[in-house]
Each structure stands twice: as C-alpha cells, then as structure tokens.
C-alpha cells in the first residue's frame, strides 16, 4: 500500500508483465523450487479496477482524470489506457506534460474529461470530511466518478459528485 507499491520492486526477483508495465506491486508471491526462493511481484489493482469500471463506461467516456500520482494511479492509468481512454494526471505539482495541478482544472478540462478516478488518500477515515479539491460545480450527469477509497463507504468526493448528478 501507500507508498510501498513502488519501493518494494528492487527487492523482488521478478515482476509479471502488468506489474512491470505499471511500475507498482501490491502482491508478492514467494516461490520455492529446489531449495531456491524467488519473490515475484504482481499488481491486482489493474484487474480489479478494469473489471469493475468497464461495465459503467458509456461511449462518451473517452478521457479520464486520475487524481494522484502514487503507485495506485499507475495501475489505474494502465487500466484506463487498456480500455481505450486517454488519461491526464492531476497532482498538487506538475510533474510532466501529462500532469496538471488542481488549480489548473478549468471548466473546459472538466467538460472534456468525463471519467474522474480518485487515487489519493484524501477523504479516507479518519479524515472523511475532506475530499480532493476539484471544481465539483462543473460535474454533470455524464461524469463518472470512481474512488479507490473504501472507508468510509461513501466518500465526500463521491457525495459531492452525486450532488451534481455524476454517477
């Protein structure tokens, strides 16, 4: 979990193809053959995410904002691209050409990117009264919000999106 999904990689003997492409691991398998131990890294976030979001996608869901740039966001980015969506990262600071800051989220960007995935810990218990700082007033019923957080059941991010009609 945060931030060890990336930091553990140098200690592993092997990565499966998805974990290697993503650059993050959340499952480690210990394989012992003829007295030799081998640690293999996998990423189950990819499969869990793509299988859960794919049925929710509509033809107008072509572009996605990924909130956060940690290990989980890498799996989400890989999964969204596998599903044919163009992605843009949102972070507190600009890292590269494929990243914007929260302050740079204009109504035009919000209108263009109809899928928004929260990959940050913002809003997780015990700070359930917080949420990522996006312009929620720009959300519409065509927007699909997805939160990786599981505690609380309904995060403030999801509630504020729902209040604007987002799914």
Residue ranges and their predicted role:
Residues 57-63, 140-141:
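Short helix-loop-beta connector
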Residues 2-9, 72, 121-124, 151:
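Short glycine-rich anion-binding loops that position phosphate/pyrophosphate groups of nucleotides
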């Amino acid at each position: 979990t945060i931030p060890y999904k990336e930091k553990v990689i140098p200690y592993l003997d092997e990565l499966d193809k998805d974990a290697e492409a993503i650059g993050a691991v959340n499952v480690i398998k210990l394989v012992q053959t003829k007295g030799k131990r081998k640690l293999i890294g996998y990423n189950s976030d990819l499969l869990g995410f793509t299988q859960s979001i794919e049925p929710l996608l509509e033809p107008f869901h072509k572009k996605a904002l990924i909130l956060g740039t940690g290990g989980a966001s890498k799996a989400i980015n890989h999964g969204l691209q596998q599903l044919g969506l163009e992605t843009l990262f949102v972070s507190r600071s600009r890292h590269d050409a494929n990243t914007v800051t929260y302050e740079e989220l204009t109504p035009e960007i919000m209108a263009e990117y109809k899928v928004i995935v929260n990959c940050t810990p913002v809003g997780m218990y015990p700070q359930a009264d917080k949420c990522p700082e996006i312009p929620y007033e720009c959300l519409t019923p065509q927007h699909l919000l997805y939160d990786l957080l599981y505690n609380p059941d309904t995060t403030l991010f999801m509630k504020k999106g729902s209040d604007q009609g987002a799914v």
